[in-house]
């Protein structure tokens, strides 16, 4: 039985809680930490609508004092937003799995932070792992696995075509959905429209797996302008305005383009005949062409990935780890 605590109960956190409750003979849920005081004292059962009397609390020290084997953090995207969660968990002697995109390869955005966490984890004999579907699998770990059947790899081109319709207002703002083209371009320039978070991380994960050294990363963000009216629960887009963002990340070895990751995301792509999907091309010997349609749902893929790594953490080496350091990921069948 693995003792697990969860930190964060948003959409991803709730999905992971469901995964945990589906494994009552494998996982003991020892505590759930929330950041919203309104959830204090309520049970997981009340949150999910299923049987579970574990109470949620803002008192993270009390939960960490129960010595969970693994703490699963599902809160923010950026390193400095999760520091006050990752550090206490490490210092309590807990392994950490976290869905923050920047944690999938933290050296890409803050090498000093990554080295600090690596040293702290080694000092306490625990492992820290960043997971998710993207970054964490579809545009990096899966590519690395496909490369294992190649004699030579010259270049990688991968595309993930997404439907943003299920997501909330924070995602819409970050992708520029509902803006005019002029507002979109201004948002890209001032950093308020970011598109996808994780291209540098995915590029470095692929490079690490293949033994390449990336010398330069370039990113471009272009508006996806709709010809038809589109709307979701959170946003309305008129014809001529922006329905999404076409974000591309390119990684160079010297002056040679070695990795190109393409990620067009928009609301209701089907309204203009666009099919969602995941595509991987490896140019080499032999060539690899993988296509999966429709897309793997980002939410389910993220919390499933997190849960399926839980049993690997006990025997993982201490330190700051990445998915390409870990054993081949797989589905964790619940004990009957």
Locations of the language-model features?
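N-terminal Rossmann-like dinucleotide-binding module
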Residues: 1-48
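Active-site-lining helix/loop region of Rossmann-like oxidoreductase modules
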Residues: 7, 147-272, 276-278, 296, ...
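Short, ordered loop/turn segments at secondary-structure junctions
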Residues: 35-37, 76, 94, 101-104, ...
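Conserved N-terminal Rossmann-fold NAD(P) cofactor-binding segment
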Residues: 36-66
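Rossmann-fold NAD(P) dinucleotide-binding segment
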Residues: 62-66, 70, 79-101
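Rossmann-fold NAD(P)-binding glycine/threonine-rich loop
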Residues: 101-126
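Alpha-helical support elements that line or immediately flank enzyme active sites
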Residues: 137-149
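C-terminal helical cap and adjacent loop that interface with cofactors, partners, or active-site loops
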Residues: 267-336
